[in-house]
Every structure is written in C-alpha cells, then in structure tokens.
Amino acid sequence: MPVAAQKTDIPELSTSVLPGYVIGAMSFIKHLRIKRAYEEPAHDDGVRILVDRLWPRGLSKPRARVDLWLKDLAPSSPLRRWFNHDPARWAEFRRRYARELDAKDRAIAALRGAVRRGRVTLLFSASDPEHNNAVALHAYLARRRTV
C-alpha cells in the first residue's frame, strides 16, 4: 500500500506510522488515533471515544460528538491529581496507570470491540498533546497488543 509515512509523537512508536497502520511490531493497532476533544470532529474520526474521567470543561456534548465515554479507562482520580500533567512525573504516571489498566478488562474489551469495527479516535481534554492519559493508553495497548 503506497502511502506516505508520518512520524508519531509517541515515544514507543518511534517507527514511521502509516495512516491506519503502525509499521512493524505495532501493526496490530489498526485505525486507532488520538485527538484532543476540543478539536473539530472530522468525518474520518470513526468512533469517537472520550477516555477522560471528567467531561471536558466548556465543551458541549453536541459540539464534542462523543460516541462513547469510557470513564473506566481513565486514570483514577487520585492518580490524575498526583500526575497533575507534570511532564517530570510522566514515566511514573505511565507505570501506575498501566497497573490500573491491567485490572480494567471490561473497559478494554469495550474499546477492543470498537476498534475491530473500524477507525477509533481516543479523545482527551488535556492541553499537553504528549503527556496525557490517551497517549499513555495508546502506548499501553501497543505494548500489551490488547486491541
């Protein structure tokens, strides 16, 4: 499939990324995107899944066009408050969040079902596009080959 490659901002996915596919060991994560909830919905977003525990501040439900809100995939409130979007805590946040995700089989199964049907966009509300739970969730799924 001759498609131009693009670079990803996710450290675990430092290989080139093709739209819809990650080259090499990550090829099982098909059609999975990450997008800030405040960005305009696009026709090719597929199923839009909010993975935050709290609804994005100031964003109306009609404007967000969220198809599924998987609060159970969000970090626990204590972990979210501890992390406080501090990049210095990113590595430890990801470790702790992965431990929480290990116990969330039902929510992972719901996400898996959506991904198997086609394109999925994980939505987050944090202002930092590189240090947020959607990026950590995507990396977790890639490492565990869960989707």
Annotate each PLM feature:
Residues 21-147:
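Residues lining hydrophobic/aromatic ligand-binding pockets adjacent to catalytic sites
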Residues 7-8:
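Polybasic, lysine-rich low-complexity intrinsically disordered segments
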Residues 14-16, 27:
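Serine residues within intrinsically disordered or low-complexity segments
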